[in-house]
């Protein structure tokens, strides 16, 4: 397994409901390293670019309106297998199908208010990280316990 980066965003419903620290804590407890963090209210342009793959879908406008309706906590996490692990931590897109113990399984009810976004692959992660962050906003740093997290 290789060290990789992924983009995670706590959506306006997750921020408004006070889940920021709990969600960050779940990623830290898993052993991933936070290398980028900021809170912003996304512009319509940013939201449209982020969800561009859904542009032709009937829910696109509502999705853009929602994600730009309030503060989003945008993050970049780093670690071995972080993309797949993050998807497992987050749970199924439809909260009622998400397993207990996942973020959506524990905290969300409605697909339109499912609290969190996570990149679904390496190409998507790179695109989303580059869209939301400038290179100078990402911190290269080393944890003092990194030798206890993995063999490599």
UniProtKB/Swiss-Prot annotation:
Catalytic activity line of the entry: a 2'-deoxyribonucleoside 5'-diphosphate + ATP = a 2'-deoxyribonucleoside 5'-triphosphate + ADP; a ribonucleoside 5'-diphosphate + ATP = a ribonucleoside 5'-triphosphate + ADP
Record CDD domains: NDPk_I
UniProtKB keywords: ATP-binding, Cytoplasm, Kinase, Magnesium, Metal-binding, Nucleotide metabolism, Nucleotide-binding, Phosphoprotein, Transferase
EC number: 2.7.4.6
Cofactor dependency: Mg(2+)
Annotated InterPro entries: NDK-like_dom, NDK-like_dom_sf, Nucleoside_diP_kinase, Nucleoside_diP_kinase_AS
An example Gene Ontology molecular-function term: ATP binding
Principal cellular location given in the protein's record: cytoplasm
One Gene Ontology CC term in the entry: cytoplasm
Top-level division of the source organism's lineage: Bacteria
Record carries keyword Phosphoprotein: yes
Catalytic residue positions: 117
Binding site for ATP: 11, 59, 87, 93, 104, 114
Annotated compartments: Cytoplasm
Function: Major role in the synthesis of nucleoside triphosphates other than ATP. The ATP gamma phosphate is transferred to the NDP beta phosphate via a ping-pong mechanism, using a phosphorylated active-site intermediate.
Family recorded in the similarity comment: Belongs to the NDK family.
Classification via PANTHER family: NUCLEOSIDE DIPHOSPHATE KINASE
Oligomer status and interactors: Homotetramer.
HAMAP family named among the record's database cross-references: NDP_kinase
Protein name: Nucleoside diphosphate kinase
